[in-house]
Every structure is written in structure tokens, then in C-alpha cells.
Amino acid sequence: MSTANPASAPDSFFSASLEQADPEIAAAIRGELGRQRHEVELIASENIVSRAVLEAQGSVMTNKYAEGYPGNRYYGGCEFVDVAENLAIDRAKKLFGANFANVQPNSGSQMNQAVFLALLQPGDTFMGLDLAAGGHLTHGAPVNMSGKWFKPVHYTVRREDQMIDMDAVAKLAEEAKPKLIIAGGSAYPRAWDFKRFREIADSVGAYFMVDMAHFAGLVAGGVHASPVPHAHVTTTTTHKSLRGPRGGLILTNDEALAKKFNSAIFPGLQGGPLMHVIAAKAVAFKEALQPDFKVYTKNVVENAKALAETLRSAGFDLVSGGTDNHLMLVDLRPKGLKGNVSEKALVRAGITCNKNGIPFDPEKPFVTSGLRLGTPAATTRGFGVAEFQQVGHLIAEVLNAIAQSSDGAAPLVEASVKQRVKELTDRFPIYQ
């Protein structure tokens, strides 16, 4: 007969720390925390969430299945997850001035897929910004579902100033007669004319959708025009400049469309929603409703302009000449550099960014002629204009050094910059 204590396994299961249960994963998390603490994060789609968001996302709500919507679930025991989801919905509506909100999309891709499922049939024509001009994979890239199942027609930017030509968009819409027109992207540094887009959509009988995943935080903070009054549907991720957990959000002012989007998410695309993530979304929306979030977003834009001007003054070309939001694209061709080589050198120097294609880029997507830089994450940790000017000079120092090297590396300069980056980040600690 066994003499083992039958309670020992459950006791360990509910009490063992991550370090005790899985030291390998614990070590990886420690390493990632160290990286975030000691590197300047300039990836435009990344941010640093609050401890409260982390706590909500790591809560016991991860245990709960809740297929359906608040008050109409397929499972019992949903009274507390209903509270969380209703708070997330109400806060999202208040934050963006929308009549309806679906907080269940697990990702940005799934929120956009839900709009397509609700509004289009396979083979239907839609318009979006070309990925090469700053659009997004889910707006009709050939490798994406949106490009495989539907018929994308892409508008682009002018060669002379790399900005969207609205007259050209109108002409293309008249020719293509799309059922849906999308504004928004992943690497467009300028403002969008939502009013004109809606007029164009109305002129051809199309729905107008805005994917504001990148600039939603700026909209919430009042430093970027809101698409919600103009669009039939607005989608956004809840991370990036909104500074929440990774996930998606669908907004509309049209009740009939809201029902379509709800059905498209569940049961159309997803089953049980991630209630721990929805709880964290609610926390992030509450944070974004506070006055200090307006200050934060104002700083994000000011810091982006400071970084852009510093790089321009150091002799670097910027796509479209600058930025109106939180991101910028550096055209590396005048320096004789490639995006992939430049990204690696900056990472070695403690500055995290990503290679990025530029409009009419002659290089392949995994090489590129550009870098994308963004200010949300470093602004969250407290960087201001002076710090971003310093970062701009450090970037220029590294890139100028590797431009003079034969192998895309400048070890002495990279090491020197990395030390100065550590001194800078030590002044702005995170998660103490």
C-alpha cells in the first residue's frame, strides 16, 4: 500500500513558484526582463505595460471558459468574467466615443479577419494601402488570408513625397468599385484624412474601415484625429501605443454592423475568449482614461519629432521628410546601408529597432533599405526630448561607423554606445 501523502502533489501544484516548477522558462523570463531594462526599445509596435496589466493578465481568469457574450454564455460560472468584460466594453466605448465595442479579438489579425467575414464574400474586391508603402499584411498581402481569399486593390504613396495621394485613391476606387476601403497601416508616419476617405467610400458604395492599431493610443490621448466618427468600423490592437495587453478591439457606431462583428468573432472565428487578457484590456482602458495618459501621448509625439529632427540634422533621410505620429522610417540608401545590417548593429549597441521596407524599396523584405523607429516604449519609461535627442545621436554614431566598415560591424563604437545606453536606461528603471 502506498505511503505517499495524497495532498503533496496538489499542494506543490498550487504553491510552487515558476522558478521551482520550470527553471528554464524562469531563466528566459529573467533574461527578457534584463533585456527590456537595459536596452532602448524603439520598435514602434512595442510598449511596456503597467504592473497592474501584468497582474490582471496573469490572474485566475485564465482558468475560465466563457463562450458567448456577457449575460449570454454557453457555460455557467461566468458572473465575474462578465464583470470584467462589461467593464472592458464600457471603458473602450468611453475611451473612443463609440456606441459599440467588441473586446474579444485575440489579435489584430483576427479582428481584421472578423471584419472581412462580416462584410465581404470570398472574391470580393477591397482597397488598402500597399504593404510596401506602409500598409499591413492583413490589408491584402498575397501571403495573407486577406490576399488569398479576397481581391485586394492597393493604393500607394507618391514617389516625390511618399505621402498618400487622395485624388489617386478616389480615382482607383472609381475604377475598382471595392466593397470595402481600408485606411491605416504599420509604417505610415503621416496623418490620415479620414473624412476624405469616407467621402470616397460613400461615392462608390463601399464600407470604410480604419485599422488604427498603431496610433490608437494617440487617438485616445487626443493628439491624433479620431476615425470613429467617420468609419463604418474601426479596429485596433490593444498593445502598441495604447499600452495594454496583446489583443484586438472592434469599434462601430452602427448597431446592425455591431451584431455582424459579434457573430463574426463568435462563433465565426473564435471559441472561448481569453478572459485574463480581456481583464487586462479593461485595466489598460481605465489607465488610458486618466489625465496622465493625455500627457503621455503628447510626449510620444513630441519625442518622435525630436528623434526625427536629430536624425535629419545628422544627415539621415526620413521617408516623407518626418513624422506626424509615433513612428518614422529612416531611408538608409544615401548612407549605403541595408536595413538588416543596420538593425543588427544597433541591437548589438543596445538599441532595439527593426529593419523595414521603404516605399518603392529595391531590396527584398528580409534585407530592406530602411529602419522603422518608434517612441512609445521609451516614452513610457520616462524618456523626454533630451533623451531622444541623445538616442538619435547614438543611432547616428553606430550607423555612420558601420557605413565605414567592410563587414557591417564596428565593435568599438558599438561597445561604447552600449555602455552609454546602459547608463541612460539605468536612470529610467522599469518593474522595480
Swiss-Prot record:
EC number: 2.1.2.1
Keyword Coiled coil: no
Residues annotated as site: Plays an important role in substrate specificity: 239
Pathway: One-carbon metabolism; tetrahydrofolate interconversion; Amino-acid biosynthesis; glycine biosynthesis; glycine from L-serine: step 1/1
GO MF term list: glycine hydroxymethyltransferase activity; pyridoxal phosphate binding
Localisation: Cytoplasm
Catalyzed reaction equations: (6R)-5,10-methylene-5,6,7,8-tetrahydrofolate + glycine + H2O = (6S)-5,6,7,8-tetrahydrofolate + L-serine
Record-linked InterPro entries: PyrdxlP-dep_Trfase (IPR015424), PyrdxlP-dep_Trfase_major (IPR015421), PyrdxlP-dep_Trfase_small (IPR015422), Ser_HO-MeTrfase (IPR001085), Ser_HO-MeTrfase-like (IPR049943), Ser_HO-MeTrfase_PLP_BS (IPR019798), SHMT-like_dom (IPR039429)
Binding site for (6S)-5,6,7,8-tetrahydrofolate: 131, 135-137
GO BP field: glycine biosynthetic process from serine; tetrahydrofolate interconversion
Pfam family, one: SHMT
Listed Gene3D superfamilies: Aspartate Aminotransferase, domain 1, Type I PLP-dependent aspartate aminotransferase-like (Major domain)
Subunit structure: Homodimer.
PANTHER family tied to this protein: SERINE HYDROXYMETHYLTRANSFERASE, SERINE HYDROXYMETHYLTRANSFERASE 1
Function: Catalyzes the reversible interconversion of serine and glycine with tetrahydrofolate (THF) serving as the one-carbon carrier. This reaction serves as the major source of one-carbon groups required for the biosynthesis of purines, thymidylate, methionine, and other important biomolecules. Also exhibits THF-independent aldolase activity toward beta-hydroxyamino acids, producing glycine and aldehydes, via a retro-aldol mechanism.
Family, similarity comment: Belongs to the SHMT family.
Annotated protein name in UniProt: Serine hydroxymethyltransferase 1
